[in-house]
Amino acid sequence: PRSTPFGTRRQRQMCIRDRMRSTPQVIGAARDAVAYARSQVEIELNGVGDNPIFFPDDDGGTYLTGANFQGTPMAFGLEMLGTAITTVSVLSERRLNRLLNRNLSCGLPAFLTKGAGMFSGMMLAQYTAGALCCEARILSAPAATGSIPAAADQEDFVSMGMTTALKAKQILKNAQAVLAIEMMAGAQAMDFRRPLKAGKGTEAAYEVIRKHVAFLEEDRPLHADINRLAAVVESGEILEAVEKAIGKLD
């Protein structure tokens, strides 16, 4: 079959899978989940969580006993947030797999290394991404349904909101590392495609990535690169550069 810099026609056809073309739809759904979680947290921060609630007036005031302490709205929002971020992480790892697997990468070298058979390239980085996704999947199991009665059954239902918050925090940290690994692989793949150029936004992201992580010429420990780029993902530097190049993504 006729070959091109992007592989044979059959290889190019194999590159088009749901995980590639579905990315905008999945990211859109995840953004909706983030917006909902944020709205619940902001409502809680601006609300009253006391019990009872006191209303002072000239006659001495009144008080109402209720359950404003109940954190279920936030717990549900954070559960949704954890699920959304985990899904984004899994999708990222699957795209990473297509960059590293020479049977799926449309002509890129195996594991994005010049020395296939002698160097591992980014193979072991995928192990890290896979492990982080597996942990996120476990953490995205709901905690809000795990209420245990306490205080002689007076407090017989609680939101488990703090547990959902701690889970979501770890899931987010994992996702930042997974995305960092995918971006490292993406930059490596772009170097192998030179002198071809990508779109303005992609090239802007590439410049930021290469400012922090060098091309993987030979095998080296990648943990420092991953941690450094994960911090860049968290900072929003890549998003800022992309939006400067192509406009707001909202």
Report residues per predicted region.
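C-terminal catalytic subdomain
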Residues: 72-194
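Long, structured protein-protein interaction/assembly regions in large complexes
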Residues: 48-75
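Charged, amphipathic alpha-helical oligomerization/scaffolding segments
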Residues: 29-36, 40, 80, 87, ...
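Short, charged/polar, low-complexity loop and linker segments
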Residues: 17, 57-64, 152-160
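N-terminal, Lys/Arg-enriched amphipathic/low-complexity engagement segments
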Residues: 42-47
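Catalytic-core signal marking the mid-to-C-terminal active-site face
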Residues: 111, 147-158, 173, 181-250
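Long, non-coiled-coil amphipathic alpha-helical linker/lever segments
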Residues: 13, 17-37
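Single conserved hydrophobic/aromatic residue that forms the stacking wall/gate
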Residues: 1-12, 16
